[in-house]
């Protein structure tokens, strides 16, 4: 996470130690994810796949200091859960960084039952829980008044937008991009259905780029050939390395994220930092980035009519949206850059009465 690299040297921070079970998970590494920058940062102590004795030694060394232990991915990686339980033996302050409950196919009550049976016992030992987005803050607050529930966000590596000139032939077209897997949960079909609801004239003012692959690609390609999408240019770009995504994004005006559920949706951060307008489903944590109206619009997940209205509004205001590129970049630098997120994160830790 880029904000981690910004923590060293900030007021109140003496040491930053990152303990991880592994680096560059295979499937993400193949897409271009890299941890080289973090590993090369000499201001941060990186501990990779440590033995339990090594973790014990770190807890013992820092328990008599003002130490926060933050756990991210505690349910996904068994070693992290073991390290969390080990931390309970030491005098350190604990916090959790988590995505909201994964509700796609798993209703909230199922998560509540699991939490009651497996996790409730630990609540009194956790001071703060940082939740991605603001959609399920109330769920976590119901469990206890002892911990502070804080809306949080992912952030991505900062990329500078490169100057470019809009092609003349696309001057009045909204160029709309999707980046992600082509699965039922990501719901790209809803995006195409929404475009089918546009008028023939509106469709001639729209082109769509789709980056990604998945089990629904063949179905989506069939939909794209429908007469109901006549006039819309739909281009399937396939899977692309992560380091090529910023360059692709800068060829578009807006990004759409139509997911039925996304814990966050970091592609939204990338889009805004490059100045794109962002159309986001209300079942994505990244909808929190749209509190500023000029950043984009939120639509009801799975509602093609509502998404069509967002697309129509974007088409009708294409000039203003293009004029707002620099404003979105400036807002992103101030609010969702690594430094901005690090400052927000640290302010919650330092403000703790026990700190």
List each language-model region with its residue ranges.
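Conserved donor-binding/catalytic core segment of Leloir-type glycosyltransferases
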Residues: 167-186, 192-195, 209
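Short alpha-helical donor nucleotide-sugar binding micro-motif in glycosyltransferases
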Residues: 239-240, 247-252
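Short hydrophobic beta-strand element within catalytic cores of glycosyltransferases
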Residues: 277-280
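Conserved acidic donor-binding segment of nucleotide-sugar-dependent glycosyltransferases
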Residues: 292-293, 297-304, 313-319
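A charged, aromatic-enriched C-terminal amphipathic alpha-helix characteristic of glycosyltransferases
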Residues: 319-350
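Aromatic "clamp/platform" in nucleotide-sugar-dependent glycosyltransferases that forms part
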Residues: 260
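Nucleotide-activated donor-binding/catalytic signature segment of Leloir-type glycosyltransferases, i.e.
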Residues: 42-46, 221-240
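Donor nucleotide-sugar binding/catalytic pocket of nucleotide-sugar-dependent glycosyltransferases
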Residues: 119-120, 124-165, 171
